[in-house]
A protein has these predicted regions:
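Eukaryote-specific, cytoplasm-facing alpha-helical/coiled-coil scaffolding segments in long proteins
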Residues: 44-62, 125-128, 139-147, 166-177, ...
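Short, hydrophobic/amphipathic alpha-helical patches that form generic packing surfaces
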Residues: 20-27, 141-151, 158-165, 185
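C-terminal regulatory/linker segments that are acidic, Ser/Thr- and Pro-rich
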Residues: 180-214
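Short alpha-helical "patches" and their helix-cap loops
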Residues: 37-45, 156-169
Length: 214
């Protein structure tokens, strides 16, 4: 077998292991993450309600508020990516949710390319074309925050814990690990939102945001 075939086989085995271990413990895990009962449930619920209020405030802002450049703003307001995010609640396994997260990111790039990409001038087939402005990490994060704020996930906080803390570590590599970090950063921005600040943490040039305590 080739290296790619070994990698696929290994990944399939890890997914099977995750399914066998996570599903029987799912109810307990959700309780521990705040979706069930327990002595700290009231505080967790209050924190999540506060986060959702802040998320609604961010969702009410236009793309320009998050400093999304005009060359990156979406005429469709990233509706395809938001719809993908909404579908995450249809999946149980952390790896399945993480896979949706990666698809959301790809959809953002695809939407940007489609809406700001090849733009024929005139009617001939040899017309010059306009190339989309490249999207760096510092450009991607504000868009991702916009999409996260406007999606309808039942619990962003629980989803964050499931993806970042309960998924098998060996699966948290490459794109999956990178966009899980983006999810953390987006949640951190929303959790620290005060309704006045108009920056998405670009002062350091890294595109980082406040760290979430959730």
């Amino acid at each position: 077998p080739t290296d790619d075939e070994w990698a696929l086989t290994r990944r399939a085995a890890l997914y099977k292991l995750e399914r066998r271990t996570f599903i029987p413990l799912q109810e307990i895990i959700y309780q521990l993450l705040g979706a069930g009962t327990g002595p700290g449930r009231g505080q967790r619920q209050e924190e999540e309600e506060r986060f959702e209020r802040l998320r609604a405030l961010v969702a009410a802002q236009p793309q320009s508020f998050l400093e999304i450049q005009p060359s990156h703003q979406s005429p469709s307001e990233w509706k395809s990516a938001i719809a993908l995010f909404d579908s995450m609640d249809n999946y149980s396994l952390p790896s399945e949710k993480a896979a949706v997260l990666v698809e959301v990111a790809r959809c953002i790039y695809e939407t940007h390319g489609r809406e700001h990409g090849a733009d024929a001038v005139g009617g001939s087939g040899a017309s010059p074309q306009k190339q989309p402005t490249p999207m760096a990490a510092a450009d991607f994060l504000p868009i991702f925050i916009f999409v996260l704020a406007r999606c309808h996930l039942r619990s962003v906080i629980v989803t964050r814990h499931l993806v970042s803390e309960t998924m098998i570590t060996a699966l948290m590599i490459g794109e999956t690990g990178y966009y899980a970090t983006m999810l953390e950063a987006a949640i951190g921005y929303i959790a620290a939102f005060d309704g006045a600040a108009k920056a998405v943490g670009r002062s350091s040039g890294s595109g980082s945001t406040a760290t979430s305590s959730f």
